C-alpha cells in the first residue's frame, strides 16, 4: 500500500490535536500532496518530508482550511531549492491558476519576497552555498484548473476526479482517486453524501472521508447540507465497497470523548470495513 501521511485531519476550528486538511502520499517513488491547509508545510517536515520532495499538489477546493498554507509551501519549496528540482505541478478546481498567480506572479502578493531573494547579494550567497548556480530563477509553477475526469498520470500512478457536493455555486469542489499498483485511495474533500463520490470510490482500498460531526446532531442544527457526518461517511463507504474508511475533517465536538466513541459506534453499525479515526 502507498504510504499516507495525515498532515491535517481537522476543520476551520483549531483544536490542540487537529486543524485544517492536508495529506501527503508516497507512491511509485514520488510524493504527492492533497490540500494544503493550516501549517501544512511545517507538518510535512515533521512527518519527515521536505517541501522540495513534493512534485504534485491537488486541491479539493479553496476554503482556507484546505489552502491557506499554499503561499508558505510555494515560497518555502522555491526558497529551499537549488534549481535542479522538478517543476511543481498543481491541480485543483476553478481559482487554482488565479491563486497561484496572485501569490508568486510578477505582481503577486509575495513578489517582493522572491525578487529580493533573487537579487540581493546576501540571498544570492545563501543560494550558492546551498548548491545553487546564479543567476537565480524566479518561482515557476505549473498550475492548472481541472474538473471531473482524468487529472494527471505520474510514473506509476494516476489521479482522477469527480464532483463533490459542498458549497456550490460559490466554490467548485472535487474528490480525487489515486490509483497505482500499490492500491487505490480516495480523498473525498468536503462533501455531502453523493452519487458521484460513491462511484469514484467504488472498490477502493481506502477512503479518507470528511466526518464533521455526529450525523443526528448535524440534522438537528442544520449543518448537514454540504457535509458528511458519521453515518453519512459510513453509508458512502459501505455502498462503495471501500475496504478501509479513514475519518478526517473531524470537528471539535466529535473530537471529544463521549461523542467520539458514539460516533465510531454509529459508523461501525453501518460500515463493515476497517475504521480509522484519524490523528495528525
Go through each PLM region and give its residues.
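Binuclear metal-dependent hydrolase catalytic cores
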Residues: 1-185, 264-280
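Cap/insert and terminal regions of metallo-dependent hydrolase folds
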Residues: 173-175, 181-186, 191-280
